[in-house]
Amino acid sequence: MARRKAAPKRETLPDPLFHSELLAKFINAVMRNGKKSVAEKIVYGALDVVAKRVQNKSGEQGDGDGESGGKAGGIKKRSLGDIRTDENARALALETFKGALDKVMPNVEVKSRRVGGSTYQVPVEIRMARRQALARRWLVEYANKRNEKTMVLRLAHEILDAVEGRGGAIKKREDVHRMAKANQAFAHYRW
């Protein structure tokens, strides 16, 4: 490992639609091969689906919840108000996304520590920046593993599942916490 000084923190510019630095970092996490415009379309599309679903759940418990992926579903989605134009939908989508991220963020993780020929898994608390980074990474990773047809739907459903306390990203967080709890006896090796 290089023994140089720590790399300086780079400033992340907020995303153009929501003016949120958190969302800009999430778009960067979704991005593959430098295709930022594709990543923006995926994230904004997913937040659009999330806003519609939350509006339908809180508002009228009607027959159309945006589940149908066909053309009729697309027409119905647009009639409710797009996040690009509707300020309330935008705020609702961002709030739901932040709630999902908060629920996925881990508090502790285990790190390997070698002591006297044995390797121990030592539980350590995580800094806020790393918590957010892990939560973003897990949301994208487990959205990719889902079975929905498009990445927009996969990401939207993973965010909605995270808000409700289920889904792959939440399971990963619980596994990390369980591992830390199991190795609590080695907490005195913390450095």
From Swiss-Prot:
Region (Disordered): 56-80
GO molecular function, one term: rRNA binding
Record PROSITE patterns: RIBOSOMAL_S7
GO cellular component: small ribosomal subunit
Gene Ontology biological process terms from the UniProt entry: translation
Ribonucleoprotein among keywords: yes
Keywords, comma-separated and alphabetical: Ribonucleoprotein, Ribosomal protein, RNA-binding, rRNA-binding, tRNA-binding
A Pfam family annotated for this UniProt entry: Ribosomal_S7
Family classification: Belongs to the universal ribosomal protein uS7 family.
Quaternary structure and partners: Part of the 30S ribosomal subunit. Contacts proteins S9 and S11.
Described function: One of the primary rRNA binding proteins, it binds directly to 16S rRNA where it nucleates assembly of the head domain of the 30S subunit. Is located at the subunit interface close to the decoding center, probably blocks exit of the E-site tRNA.
Name this protein carries in UniProt: Small ribosomal subunit protein uS7
